[in-house]
Swiss-Prot record:
Name of the protein described by the UniProt record: Ribosome-binding factor A
Main location: cytoplasm
Record carries keyword Cytoplasm: yes
Lineage top rank: taxon: Bacteria
GO annotations of cellular component type: cytosol
GO BP: maturation of SSU-rRNA
Localization per Swiss-Prot or TrEMBL: Cytoplasm
Keywords, in A-Z order: Cytoplasm, Ribosome biogenesis
Example of a GO MF term: ribosomal small subunit binding
Positions in coiled-coil regions: none
Purpose of the protein: One of several proteins that assist in the late maturation steps of the functional core of the 30S ribosomal subunit. Associates with free 30S ribosomal subunits (but not with 30S subunits that are part of 70S ribosomes or polysomes). Required for efficient processing of 16S rRNA. May interact with the 5'-terminal helix region of 16S rRNA.
PANTHER family tied to this protein: RIBOSOME-BINDING FACTOR A, CHLOROPLASTIC-RELATED
UniProt-listed SUPFAM superfamilies: Ribosome-binding factor A, RbfA
Gene that encodes it: rbfA
Length: 122
């Protein structure tokens, strides 16, 4: 990642976080912008979001984000249009690291709480 794309990614993440917090508040799953990756030509911004909620709620919110992409891009444009010639297209992806970490935690707890199993040394 070049310095320029890194700065653009950071700015987009900050502005999108602010948009979701202040201009598009929703009840339902908690939404956090984990990372924004911008293509080298700055034409596409891939926005990775972490969602905490039920599977159904998360699915509905991802669908909502896909449907509202143009509106979100318009809000973003109104904030940063003086810094860019062209506002990147937005693509939203669910970041599943939280779910993976939670599943690993559950498996570890389950393994540690199994009664009657003795560990042997090799």
């Amino acid at each position: 990642m070049s310095i320029r794309t890194g700065k653009v990614s950071s700015l987009l993440q900050k502005e999108l976080s602010s948009i979701f917090e202040k201009e598009l508040p929703r009840s339902g799953p908690l939404l956090t912008i984990v990372e924004v990756k911008v293509t080298a030509d700055l034409g596409i911004a891939r926005v990775y979001v972490s969602l905490i909620g039920s599977e159904k709620e998360r699915g509905l919110l991802m669908e909502h984000l896909q449907n509202e992409t143009k509106y979100i891009r318009k809000l973003l444009s109104s904030r940063i249009r003086h810094q860019f010639r062209r506002i990147p297209e937005l693509e939203f992806y669910e970041d599943e690291q939280y779910d993976k970490a939670r599943r690993i935690e559950e498996l570890l707890k389950e393994a540690l709480n199994r009664p009657g199993e003795e560990q042997t040394e090799s």
